[in-house]
Amino acid sequence: MALETVPKDLRHLRACLLCSLVKTIDQFEYDGCDNCDAYLQMKGNREMVYDCTSSSFDGIVAMMSPDDSWVSKWQRITNFKPGVYAVSVTGRLPQGIVRELKSRGVVYKSRDTAIKT
């Protein structure tokens, strides 16, 4: 796991609404999302960080070896970079972003376990 993907503080943590990666708000703004920045372009854009992440999430798991981990299969994060992930993320991406993802062939499934999609 790369050191820059580990949250540097326990305050101001947010989880990506697309992949559930957990970082501080400053890490998302400075580095973007390690898995989704090609689609969400949060790097250097605090407004996009607020739109595409949530401060409300339940549980965290540290995923180091995606191919060997049953947790990564359970959480649907097998194809993502090693890092710290939320078990459930409250909220949804804005409709405009969901439409853009769909036009690029990316299927968005909410990571909010309270909502069935």
Curated annotation (Swiss-Prot):
Transmembrane segments: none annotated. GO terms for cellular component: DSIF complex. The keyword Phosphoprotein does not apply. The gene is supt4h1. The keyword S-adenosyl-L-methionine does not apply. GO terms for biological process: regulation of DNA-templated transcription; transcription elongation by RNA polymerase II; transcription elongation-coupled chromatin remodeling. Belongs to the SPT4 family. Residues 1-40 are annotated as: Interaction with SUPT5H. A zinc finger (C4-type) spans 16-36. May function as a component of the DRB sensitivity-inducing factor complex (DSIF complex), which regulates transcription elongation by RNA polymerase II. Probably enhances transcriptional pausing at sites proximal to the promoter, which may in turn facilitate the assembly of an elongation competent RNA polymerase II complex. GO terms for molecular function: RNA polymerase II complex binding; zinc ion binding. Interacts with SUPT5H to form the DSIF complex. DSIF interacts with RNA polymerase II and with the positive transcription elongation factor b complex (P-TEFb complex), which is composed of CDK9 and cyclin-T. This is Transcription elongation factor SPT4. It is found in: Nucleus.
